[in-house]
Amino acid sequence: MSMNSFGHLFRVTTWGESHGPALGATVDGCPPGVPIEEAMIQHWLDRRKPGQNKYTTQRREADEVKILSGVFEGQTTGTPVQLMIENTDQRSKDYGDIKDKFRPGHADITYFQKYGIRDYRGGGRSSARETAARVAAGGLAREAIRALAPNAQITGYMVQMGPHRIDRARFDWAQIEQNPFWVPDAQAASDWADYLDGLRKSGSSVGAVIEVVARGVPAGLGAPVYGKLDTDLAAAMMSINAVKGVEIGEGMAAAELTGEANADEIFMGQNGPQYSSNHAGGILGGISTGQDIVVRFAVKPTSSILTTRKTITKSGEETEIITKGRHDPCVGIRAVPVGEAMMACVILDHLLLHRGQIGANRGHIG
């Protein structure tokens, strides 16, 4: 098994490499009758595409999506939807000097150890370029969610860059689209711009923490033990390039709390059960509660930096390497729309699973 697919009923297979002619996604299991046009998916791809500001890689890709199958007269047909994005701005010559060297911090060495061959041009399949296909699939998932959970909204934003965190007291949803970092804190966005400018000019990089919230998701999604909603969300986020950690709700900080502080107390509201807090991140026992679903993931610093580092060649000789090419000083910036896309795919998948198992019937309280 090559493990290029994810999902249960809404199943996404991505394909293509960083410097190949194209990449894309084959989406199987999308319900029929979902209104979809290329422009709807393009909207989400435009938020991720490179070269939009000085804080991301200067590789210039239009990232124009083409729908090749599964859509007729502006609606999905229920058959596989094929999405393709052409690569147009590859500079493979930037990687000629490292074709026999392994870049520290990259997947070069592990791909070679596993397969005995690797595409050294931009990392091939291990490149974050692959995530464009995920965002395209996520755009389709968002449109399908509208029909099944019309109140659902999925929003991602950065909450930490290097050692610098947002001030939750200044959290403003309206600020997220107003700065290049997708930060809900205007002061943090300004401070981070100065911080990243210094790192970028020095040729270094930095990690980040991204938070993705799904609001308006109904209670009841997910299943006990091995079909947990948070299991699939954690796996989806962990599969994103450079991700080294995932948290749901309070996450690791829950270990510092007492039982009294961590348990979200329940009371009856006008529209059913309500909670005094959301330490659980909208999921209990692997099943959604109806509260906001909150997921965070941490991305490591970009490994491609302009500092000379020690490494080895394919023949085992010790040497040094300097990475050329165009790279993100903070991959967390463009990971925001990727995290949103993965959230959308998982939520839709579980909406379909829930509908298939339970239908319209649910436990009613009050």
Swiss-Prot record:
Amino-acid biosynthesis as a keyword of this entry, yes or no, is yes
Q: How is the cofactor bound?
A: Reduced FMN (FMNH(2)).
Please give the catalytic activity noted in the UniProt record.
5-O-(1-carboxyvinyl)-3-phosphoshikimate = chorismate + phosphate
Task: List the Gene Ontology MF annotations in alphabetical order.
Answer: chorismate synthase activity; FMN binding
Query: Which residues of this UniProt protein bind NADP(+)?
Result: R48
Question: What protein name applies here?
Answer: Chorismate synthase
As for what it does, the entry says: This reaction introduces a second double bond into the aromatic ring system.
Q: Which NCBIfam families match?
A: aroC (TIGR00033), PRK05382.1 (NF003793)
Cofactor(s) for this protein? FMNH2
Top EC group: lyase
Could you tell me the keywords of this UniProt record?
A: Amino-acid biosynthesis, Aromatic amino acid biosynthesis, FAD, Flavoprotein, FMN, Lyase, NADP
